[in-house]
Curated annotation (Swiss-Prot):
EC number: 4.1.1.48
HAMAP family xref list: IGPS_B (MF_00134_B)
Database matches in Pfam families: IGPS
Annotated catalysed reactions: 1-(2-carboxyphenylamino)-1-deoxy-D-ribulose 5-phosphate + H(+) = (1S,2R)-1-C-(indol-3-yl)glycerol 3-phosphate + CO2 + H2O
Molecular functions (GO terms): indole-3-glycerol-phosphate synthase activity; phosphoribosylanthranilate isomerase activity
Protein name (Swiss-Prot/TrEMBL): Indole-3-glycerol phosphate synthase
């Protein structure tokens, strides 16, 4: 019997989590909360408009820990980080809500979104429509669908639920087969290429570059994970990739928003430093 991968363990836990949560708050109750939530802020549109101008469209991630790295940021105040990112030039935010593996929380998403005007994606492992409605009830503007965690029928069902409650969808792929499935099953314009293999957690930017020619021009390619320095950003720009999801590089910095500027808007850093002096 093979040992379950990290992703397989996370997904198994998600099914348990949905059962536990739905026993406390019914889907009907969640739907009422979702209808009463603030209007979505237009996650996909914000990224597309920025990338059209060939400017970095950065989804800046708020993440305390990960299964592969443990605790990444000790001083963790989501609202503070969100404000720092907004000042640093982020287009959107990503907030981890997975409790068991990433030390996330639903409250972190609510706190971050309340502190800024940026659209926010709920970064979690979606396996059931309940979680999609829950995301909207929490105030999220977008949800993540990970192709390697879903079959095509479930993927389509979750995307339909997202559309029903007004959420954008970011579909995440890691290889050619997953990309083909995503393009065939979903019409979302947001295609994220995770440079991290979620089964082994190894990272390679070649993943994005290899898949790029197969992503249609009417979809927005978003490179995720492994962007650590200016050379990485410039490599993507040369290949006409302008949208990024970055977490760890920012979370390890004392000032996450300033690190965002260093990576993506270096001409702004000098001005910011002068303002701080």
């Amino acid at each position: 019997m093979s040992v379950p991968t990290v992703l397989e363990r996370i997904i198994a836990r998600k099914f348990q989590e949905v059962a536990e949560r739905s026993a406390h708050v019914s889907l009907a109750e969640l739907e009422g909360l979702a209808k009463a939530a603030d209007a979505p802020r237009g996650f996909a549109n914000a990224l597309i408009e920025q990338a059209k101008r060939k400017q970095p469209a950065v989804i800046a991630e708020i993440k305390k820990a990960s299964p592969s790295k443990g605790v990444i940021r000790e001083h963790f105040v989501p609202a503070e980080i969100a404000v720092s990112y907004e000042k640093g030039g982020a287009t959107c935010l990503s907030v981890l809500t997975d409790v068991d593996y990433f030390q996330g929380a639903d409250e972190y998403l609510q706190q971050a979104r309340a502190a800024v005007s940026l659209p926010v994606i709920r970064k979690d492992f979606m396996v059931d429509p309940y979680q999609i409605v829950e995301a909207r009830a929490l105030g999220a503007d977008c949800v993540l669908l990970i192709v390697s965690a879903l079959d095509d029928v479930k993927m389509a069902e979750l995307a339909a639920t997202a559309k029903d409650v007004g959420l954008d969808v970011l579909v995440e792929v890691h290889d050619g087969d997953e990309l083909e499935r995503a393009l065939k099953t979903l019409d979302t314009p947001l295609v994220g290429v995770n440079n991290r293999n979620l089964h082994t957690f190894e990272v390679s930017l070649e993943t994005t570059l290899d898949l790029l020619p197969r992503i249609p021009r009417d979809r927005l390619a978003i490179t995720e994970s492994g962007i650590l320095n200016r050379a990485d950003v410039e490599l993507m720009a040369i290949n006409e990739v302008y949208s990024f999801l970055v977490g760890e590089a920012f979370m390890r910095a004392e000032q996450p928003g300033l690190e965002l500027q260093r990576l993506f808007f270096p001409e702004q850093v000098k001005k910011t430093v002068q303002q701080l002096d």
